Amino acid sequence: MTVLHSAPRWSSNEGVLDTLVAALGDMVAASREEHGEILLTVVRDRVEDALRLLRDDHEYQQLMDIAGVDYPQRAERFDVCYCLLSVTKNHRVIVKVSTDEATPVPTVTTLWPNAGWYEREVYDMFGVLFAGNPDLRRILTDYGFQGHPFRKDFPLTGYVELRYSEEDKRVVYEPVQLAQDLRQFDFMSPWEGADYVLPGDEKAVPPPPAPAPVATAPETKGDAKADVPKTTEQPADTGAGEKANDAAAKPVAEAAAPAATKTDEPAAPEPTEDRPARKPRAKKVADTEGATEPAAKPKRTRKKKEDGE
């Protein structure tokens, strides 16, 4: 048998904002509905009382998360956001308080024990202090870490480089070698009419273009088709005198290709030899059988032994 939960699958925000603002009274500093969420900004010193009232009287039983937001242009630059959930109404609400680097926020570990780690995360990342937290220390960064990484003025490269040294056989801390420029915050959007260069964008301005070179007439090495051929100006310029000038002035016809003829080319001459012919051999090679056969070996003869020897 399927048991259905009494909480609705979808809950509306209609009338919720007015009900909660009326219940909290002077503890509410501001309230609005944005992106389908109910946002309540309460007085910092009374945040514990406001959250207790929402938990006990309006059935927001669970603290789902505590988040921090940094607005460096404000005097109280940090917002601490408490995300609450009602499991019986299937509804969520966000409660916010504002603070700065030195002013602590009252802890809510007395209401939800899991708030201890959430407050430690906000302290580690943003540097927000929580008065009454029994174990307010870093939870995400390493021991001895300097600064708070989620602040807008924290450099992307950090201040210290953490690495393992093969020489020392241990983890060492070294200062970052990159140049750390001082960051300036200018929150005016360039799309709102800013007519100045934002800090860090000086290199993005293109340099003025180089002056154009003075135009000069193109140098001509000579006309490809000259109407009058170049001749000597004086007879003394050439050893041939004026006749050479007259000959140079006459147009020269282009050489034509040789006409094809149907006559056959003459045959090559017969080769001749000045050396006299060799005398014929007296005998043929076939008649020299005796000369080519090996000579016969002489036969050995033994002397007969005489009687009496």
Swiss-Prot record:
Comp. bias regions, Low complexity: 246-261
Biased composition regions of type Basic and acidic residues, renumbered to the chain: 220-230
Alphabetical list of Pfam families matching this protein: Complex1_30kDa (PF00329)
InterPro entries listed in its UniProt record: NADH_DH_suC, NADH_quin_OxRdtase_su_C/D-like, NADH_UbQ_OxRdtase_30kDa_su
HAMAP family membership: NDH1_NuoC
Primary gene name: nuoC
Reactions that this protein is recorded to catalyse: a quinone + NADH + 5 H(+)(in) = a quinol + NAD(+) + 4 H(+)(out)
Subunit field text: NDH-1 is composed of 14 different subunits. Subunits NuoB, C, D, E, F, and G constitute the peripheral sector of the complex.
Example of a GO cellular component annotation carried by this entry: plasma membrane
UniProt keyword annotations, A-Z: Cell inner membrane, Cell membrane, Membrane, NAD, Quinone, Translocase, Transport, Ubiquinone
Function field: NDH-1 shuttles electrons from NADH, via FMN and iron-sulfur (Fe-S) centers, to quinones in the respiratory chain. The immediate electron acceptor for the enzyme in this species is believed to be ubiquinone. Couples the redox reaction to proton translocation (for every two electrons transferred, four hydrogen ions are translocated across the cytoplasmic membrane), and thus conserves the redox energy in a proton gradient.
Similarity comment: family membership: Belongs to the complex I 30 kDa subunit family.
Enzyme Commission number(s) from the entry: 7.1.1.-
Molecular function per GO: NADH dehydrogenase (ubiquinone) activity; NADH:ubiquinone reductase (non-electrogenic) activity; quinone binding
Region feature (Disordered): 198-309
Protein name according to UniProt: NADH-quinone oxidoreductase subunit C
Membrane topology recorded in Swiss-Prot or TrEMBL: Peripheral membrane protein
Compartmental location: Cell inner membrane
